[in-house]
Each structure stands twice: as structure tokens, then as C-alpha cells.
Amino acid sequence: RSLVGSEMCIRDSYDPRVSFLATVDEKKIAALMCLEITDGMDLHSYNGPVVERTAYKAGLIKAGTSYRLITHLEQKALRIAAMTQRETGCAISIHTENGTMGPQILDILAAAGADLEKTVLCHVQRDPNLVYYKKLLDRGAVLCIEEANKPHLRSDQALAEILKQLVDAGYKQQLLLGMDGGRQEALAAYMAPEGIANGLSYLFADFAPMLLQQGISASALEMMLVHNPARVFSMEVS
């Protein structure tokens, strides 16, 4: 069992007049990001005025893009993510808004020297397009297929069918499974005062058995749940 802390510049939600993402040189920000991985995460999330390193080191670089758009600041964040990865070997996780802009994200990261085999594109299941997925996977990227137990978005059955098609097409080594469950309603312990709720364990207790029933082999499921995360998130630590 493990928890991986991430450091992030996610989407264009930073004030272009005063935020450090907007006003500080890319190389200087990348140096700060590297220190979060090698030395420890800042207690104040670099909000200043001082930096106090904690004992906890980041193990994931995160950036994000907008819906059908990558703003100038988001492009800068992607380049910084690539620079940080080059120095540390840490994986990059990209928030895509409704799965859009995947090819353009990979273009920017590749041009900045990122390792696309350690680059995870998240939320792509929002755009259920097998041709689109294959275009991203054929460039070496990793896709995180998420949002089981969210019937207001799509049924679990539809999500399972997407995964079965990708596994059958030979991409099982480039797939991760997740819940996108950072909000309160996705956490059983937080919802306990209200009653019984499905938590993050739904992925293993309910969705994984459905994948087996769908015809995905136990070895392919283990690949997506165990071996792929171990490979993608591995890095040399001092």
C-alpha cells in the first residue's frame, strides 16, 4: 500500500499579474518543483513568504489543461513539468478537461523532452472514442480510465466495454484504473454521517469483478491495477 503525493500547476486558474507561474522563469519554477521531489514538499505550497520543507516528498508531477484549449500559462506549466521530469525521472499526470487536447498536450511535452511512457493522461474516458485513444496510446502515453460508479456520466458497463476493447487491441500495458475520487462524496468515511456510501474500494470490490465478467483476463486486470502503476510511478530516490 502506498500514497503518492503530487505537486501541481493545474489549469489556467492563476492570476496572470501576480502568480509565480505567470511571473517566474520556467527554469526557476522547475528547480522548485525538483526540490519538492528530492528534498521535501513545502509546508506552505510555495505560497511564501518562507519555504519550510516537510519530510514528505512528492512522487508525481501534475499539470492540467482547459476544455478544447491549452492556454499560454498551461503551456508553460506543461514545459515545466517536462523539465522537472527530465531532472528527476518522476511521472507526469495530466488533467485533461473532458478528455480534450490529448495530442496537443503530448506535442508540447515531447518537444520539451518529456518521457511519454511516464506520462499519464487522465479523464480521457469523458470522450469515448476508441480511435482517439489509440492515437494517444500509439505515441507511448499512458491512459488512466476512471469514474466507475458515476452513472450520471456513463454506466459501468459502458466503461468496462471501453477497457475490453483497449485490452483486446493490445494496449493493456498502457492502461491505469482510477476513481477520480478526491471529492467528499466519493469517500465512504466522509459520507458515513449521512449513511452508507460507496468509497474508493468500489474499484476493487465491484468494478474489477465486472471487468472479469466482461472477459478481461485476470492477468490483464493485474497488469492494470498492479504492474503498470509500479512501472509508471517508479523512480530513483536518494
Stretches with model-predicted labels:
Residues 1-10:
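Single conserved hydrophobic/aromatic residue that forms the stacking wall/gate
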Residues 85, 143, 180, 221, ...:
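Divalent metal-coordination and catalytic microenvironments
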Residues 121-127, 146-165:
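Active-site glycine- and acidic-residue-rich loops that bind
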Residues 201-238:
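Mid-to-C-terminal alpha-helical segments outside catalytic/metal-binding sites
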Residues 44-128:
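Divalent metal-binding pocket/active-site signature
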Residues 31-53, 160-172:
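Short amphipathic alpha-helices and their capping/turn segments at secondary-structure boundaries
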Residues 11-14, 66, 97-99, 124-127, ...:
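Active-site beta-loop-alpha junctions enriched in small/polar residues
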Residues 146-147, 171-194, 221:
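Short acidic/histidine-rich active-site segments
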